[in-house]
Regions:
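P-loop NTP-binding core
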Residues: 1-175
Length: 175
């Protein structure tokens, strides 16, 4: 995106409007297109949204309510989030049908993965019974390290046959 500040309505604006019970703008005001891909921009406003969501009743459904009218317009809606587990990510999981779990093969990766799977299970039970795990995607794997190999092996040994493990990895090759 050439100039994010020029975007009049971002997902942050939409979520703030939802929190404040304001009417949402029409699709044309916030859906942008580039190279045949439609998207809703983000901005730093999401930091303020995250803080406000913590004080809001029914906060975990805000994003779901925004995206619901778009479900019939698209074959798939991809929600890209930061690797944290705050109110915004809970919203993303509450709105999703499937989640691809990205795992950076580092020392605490398995612990984080186990915790995240527990969170998915809770969200499925309490908020979104459609949610399922599409698979695990290993990312940022430094093929030169034994740690990467060990964690990759642990993920396979622990989850193979239960959860799909995507074959592609982002390799770090430094000269």
């Amino acid at each position: 995106m050439e100039n994010p500040a020029a975007v009049p309505v971002t997902i942050g604006h939409l979520m703030m409007a939802q929190i404040d019970d304001d009417e949402l703008p029409g699709f044309k005001e916030y859906i942008q297109s580039r190279n045949g891909v439609d998207f809703i921009s983000s901005s730093m406003m999401l930091s303020a949204v995250d803080a406000k969501l913590r004080l809001e009743m029914g906060a975990e459904k805000m994003l779901s309510e925004i995206l619901e009218p778009l479900r019939d317009r698209y074959d798939a809606i991809i929600i890209d989030t930061a690797p944290t587990l705050g109110a915004l990510n809970i919203n993303a999981l509450a709105a999703a049908d499937e989640v691809i779990i990205t795992v950076n093969p580092q020392l605490l990766a398995m612990m984080g993965l186990q915790d995240f799977l527990k969170t998915v299970k809770k969200i499925r039970a309490r908020v979104n019974d459609r949610l399922s795990v599409a698979g695990i995607l290993l990312t940022i794997c430094d093929a030169r390290t034994n740690l990467c190999k060990v964690i990759t092996e642990q993920v396979r040994d622990t989850f193979e046959g239960q959860i799909r493990i995507f074959e592609s990895r982002t390799l770090i090759l430094l000269k």
